[in-house]
Every structure is written in C-alpha cells, then in structure tokens.
A protein has these predicted regions:
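Bacterial N-terminal signal peptides that target proteins for export
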Residues: 45-59
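Conserved N-terminal/central alpha/beta ligand/cofactor-binding core
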Residues: 95-102, 107-190, 230, 238-240
Length: 589
C-alpha cells in the first residue's frame, strides 16, 4: 500500500490530528525510505501491541524513529542544494540562507571563495564597479574595509578567504567541504522525470532538494543531469561572430584583438627541437596544423594557469626553486624567444593592496605562465586525470618562474627582476604558499534557449530578461602555439575587444532549455558562446548570477513552477529589492 503520513498514523494508532501539519510530509519522506524494512523487524512487530495501548509510548517511539531517519540523512529535503567550488557558490549559499531557505553547500574543495580566495587578487571589471550590486558588492566593500579603504580593485588571497569565511559564518551557512559528485553514469544524479531528485557523492552521501544550483567552474552536475552543453569554440558562422573560432596571431590587422602585439610573438622563433630541422620534431606544446583558417570551430579551450601570489618581502619570501620533474625543453620556446630579441617581461605583474610587497603574477606576451594546450581534456576528464593536469601546470609554472630567475639565457634585466620574487609564507599556508586552485578560465558551457553571444556584448542585441550585467572585454588567452607556413612559432586564439557599454545577461542563459531539467541553475557554466563567455567569466559576474539564481529558485518553489516558467517581472522586482544591477548606470561622481 502507499506509504504516507496517514499510513504512519494508522499503523501506530495515532489520531491524524495529533500529527502537526508541517511534520506530515517529513514523516512521509522518512517512511518512503524506511517503512518496508522497518515494519518487518521482529522487535518492532513485538512492541506494536504496547504501542497501540500507549499513545505516549507510541509518540516517543515514532519520534525516535523519525530522528533516526533525519540523522541518517535520508529524510532531509533541503530547499536548495548548492554544488560548487566558485565564489558564486559562496554567494548563492549566503543568499539562500538570508532568504530563509534550508540550504546546504557541497564544496568540492577545502576552502570557500573559489578563485577569489585562491590567487585571483586583481579583479577584472575594468573599473566598472557600478555594474554589480547585491552580495557581490558587499564582498568587495568588505575587502576594501579590511584595508581601511573605500574602494580597492586588488587584494591578497588571504583577505578574500577571511571575508568569505566571515560572511558564511554570519549567515549561518552549512558547508560540507571536500564533497565530490559521483560522476559514475547513472549514480551521481537521480532524476524524477525532468527534475533532479537527489545527488550522490563519492563519500556515499546522498542529498535531496527541491532546487539545485551547479556553481562549479566545470559544470559536472549540469552535465550529469543531461543538460545540453558544449566545450570549445564555435565556428564563426554559427552565431555570426567575427571573433569566433580560430584566430591566428599572424593575421594583420587583427580585428579580433585591439591591444597591438601584446600576447603574440613579435620575433621569428624556430619551433623545432633542432633549429631548422623539422625532422627533429616540434618543441613541447607546439602544433603544426594544416589549413588552419580563421573562423574554424574546434573543441579546444583557452589556456589555464595558477594565479600565484608572489612577494618581495624578505620576511615572507619563499624562494623559487627548480621543481621536481623540471625539463628545460619545456621552456625552450621561452628562451628562444628571448634570444630572438623579445625583451619584454613575460608576465602581467599587478600589485595587491596591503604592504605593497605582494603581486598577482599573471600570464602576458608570447610565452608566459599559461600552459597553452595543456588543458584541453580538463572539462570532461576524470577527477584523477584533472589532478594530473593540475600537477603538470604546477610543474610548468614553477619551472617557468625558476627559469626566469636562474637561467643564464634569460636577459639579465629580466632575470634580476624575477629573482626578487618568491612565494609568500602567509598565503596558502597549508600548501607552501602555492594556490589551492588552478585558474579554470573556461570549461563546459550550457546551451540553453538563450545563448549569450558577441552581439549581446556589443549591444547589437539586448536580452529582455537580464539578471545581471557583463562589462569586461571579450577576452581569450592563447589556445595553442602553432607553426606558421613560414616555419615560425605563433600564438592562436588570443582575442580582446571591449564592449562599448555594460550589457544585460539573460535569465535564460543560467537555466536549461525548456524541456530539459526543471529544477537546476547553472550560473557559472552559463549558456554563452566562447566569445561572449570571455567577457562574462569574471568573478563579480559569477557572484551576481549565482545570487540571481537563488532568488529565482525561491520564486519557483513559492509558485510551484519549473525554473523555465518563473515569471520574469516578479523575478525582476525581487532582484531589484536585493540591490542587483540590471541595467547600465552612470558612474558615481
């Protein structure tokens, strides 16, 4: 027979009115898992007569059973389960808790805040601080306050971590760290029709909710739920984007790139192991591709790196040493580029707020800290393979830093400058000063009913249902080093063009298309082309879209609708109440 709270009352001889209304669905949920087995236990069957004759004993026994189910995690149905490692995941959890929702945050990492706590100290929003509000604005205000300032753009990783920890604690967010989704097909996500009913982790724990938010940088939950997504670059003709697909660095004028020769080779560099001898093979991570033409699509993504926090403070300085597994051949392209006459420091060194000794060391110019081509498998890779890719990046970047500071083939001025820097003892203290997280600039991208494209970024199309703003340049780091027809190394995939003004990001770009999963949001791996994603992939945007997702989830629950059927006008009102910014505003004087 159907197990329900009425069945619970009938078997235990409890008057239905004695069961509070708010407890009935919870009891029903617990029994749905426990009842068939529970009533077959001999000791339980033997005490039933006593229970029928004693209502207090009955209620006591029922309560014990009920709380056993709760403690086993089999009864609890949260309003919202958030899965993710990003700054957006933290903001979503805070937002849900403030909204009075029962929420649990399942964090695949051991720390909160994503890249905003793991080295991305130089926040990319082009000074357009007026393009986001809500909890994202609170976070950056708290960062500034930590330095005794009204406004800062860059900050130390440890300060980002401290601010997120405090905001999470004040909100009372329940976080489970190091909780990884079981990605075994058919095991990690249990669907009930078009809704996720529960998700199961590698720990064996299962979590149930009415709404789920995938706030991960890679979109594992979104993919496991059967939502349409893509990886790589669309061809130019798919969305009629003149920056899409392959973009050769030797194409001039570079209409897809407005920063002259930055991030490109400016000298002729031989790509072969033995210079001038193609038969010797290519240097590591250089590719010879026949008929490589601008506008072609592929499955490749822009390069990753670690955003290392370096310092010149002798009291904090951890020396850069030659890493285990170092191979000079991995850095031969860098060395030959110097020897060919490119004397630019191959790094974007951005000072961080604080004592003035720390910097956010990022990739720049022809060969830098990006390991182009080393990450193409990352989005779909197993957890084990991802760890291998991360380790390869760490070895490469440690080797790159050591080469800059120690190799005599590096120009003296650059070697002297690089040798001043070391990792910082007071950052990532449990990891030797090395960032916890690799910088995942791009992974999976959902394909929904509204795909954000270059046309949205450039104001040629405007989403009628904005839930946040984007403003950063359409930006892709190098995708690959390739051999030109003349036999020299060049970069491919680098794009940059700044939108004329901030633009709206569609609500439909953070939810699956109609007909797919009805209780899932994807505010990090959102629906966007490679070109548009390059502009939208900024930490303040991730935070903004994640808060908007939570607010929309609340509406969907309150109205008992799918995420696709949320009324936008009602959502817009709630977003504005939460101080989200939905349209371009003049800068404050």
């Amino acid at each position: 027979r159907r197990v329900s709270w009425r069945y619970f009352a009938d078997v235990l001889a409890i008057e239905i009115d004695d069961i509070p209304e708010e407890k009935r669905s919870a009891i029903s949920a617990a029994l749905r898992f426990k009842a068939p087995f529970f009533w077959k236990i001999p000791i339980i069957r033997s005490v039933l007569p006593l229970m029928n004759s004693s209502k207090p004993l009955c209620l006591l026994f029922a309560s014990a059973f009920f709380f056993t189910a709760v403690c086993n995690g089999e009864e609890k149905i949260h309003d919202i389960v958030i899965y993710g490692d990003s700054s957006g995941a933290a903001v979503a959890a805070i937002s849900a808790k403030r909204d009075g929702r029962s929420v649990i945050w399942l964090n695949p990492t051991s720390f909160p805040g994503g890249m905003s706590s793991s080295g991305l100290g130089a926040t990319d929003f082009l000074g357009r601080r007026n393009t986001f509000g809500g909890i994202a604005s609170e976070f950056y205000d708290a960062i500034a306050a930590a330095y005794g300032e009204k406004y800062v753009r860059s900050f130390e990783p440890k300060v980002g971590l401290q601010v997120f920890k405090k905001m999470i604690a004040v909100a009372g967010v329940e976080v489970v760290y190091n909780e990884l989704l079981d990605r075994t097909p058919g095991k990690g996500v249990k669907m009930n029709g078009k809704k996720i009913e529960s998700i199961t982790m590698l720990s064996g724990k299962t979590y149930r909710a009415k709404m789920f938010i995938d706030a991960s940088y890679v979109g594992d939950l979104m993919a496991a739920a059967g939502v349409t997504y893509t990886v790589g670059r669309e061809p130019e003709n798919q969305y009629n984007e003149d920056m899409a697909g392959v973009r050769r660095g030797d194409t001039k004028p570079r209409l897809h790139y407005t920063q002259k020769d930055k991030d490109h080779f400016i000298k002729q560099v031989d790509p072969y192991i033995t210079p001038g001898k193609p038969e010797s093979g290519l240097l590591p991570k250089i590719y010879k591709i026949e008929n490589l033409t601008n506008g072609q699509g592929d499955k490749k993504i822009q390069a990753y790196n670690y955003r290392v926090c370096l310092t010149t403070d002798p009291n904090l300085h951890i020396p850069i040493v030659k890493p285990e597994g170092y191979n000079e051949l991995d850095h031969e392209l860098l060395l030959r580029n110097f020897e060919a006459g490119d004397l630019r420091m191959p790094a974007l060194i951005e000072p961080l707020s604080g004592t003035g000794s720390k910097v956010d060391w990022n990739n720049m110019h022809a060969v830098g800290s990006d390991l182009a081509g080393g990450n193409w498998d990352y989005p779909e890779a197993s957890y084990e393979k991802r760890r291998e890719i991360e380790k390869a990046h760490e070895t490469y970047i440690r080797g790159f830093l050591w080469t800059l500071s120690s190799n005599p083939r590096v120009p003296e001025a650059i070697r002297k400058q690089a040798s001043k820097y070391g990792l910082s003892k007071d950052e990532f203290t449990d990891n030797g000063g090395w960032p916890w997280m690799i910088y995942i600039r791009e992974a999976r991208r959902m394909v929904s009913d509204y795909v954000m494209t270059q046309h949205d970024c450039e104001g040629k199309r405007s989403a009628p249902d904005p839930v946040g703003l984007g403003s950063f340049g359409m930006d892709s780091h190098c995708v690959q080093h390739f051999v030109t027809e003349s036999g020299h190394a060049q970069n491919e995939g680098v794009i940059w063009r700044v939108p004329p003004k901030p633009y709206g990001i569609s609500y439909r770009s953070i939810i699956p298309k109609k007909g797919e999963c009805e209780n899932l949001f994807s505010p990090i791996c959102f629906s966007a082309s490679h070109v548009a994603h390059g502009s939208m992939r900024m930490e303040p945007v991730f935070m903004t879209l994640s808060e908007s997702a939570v607010i929309a989830a609340g509406l969907a629950m309150d109205k008992n609708t799918s995420v696709q059927d949320v009324d936008y006008e009602a959502l817009k009102k709630k977003l504005l109440d939460a101080k989200q910014i939905l349209q371009n505003q003049p800068l404050a004087q």
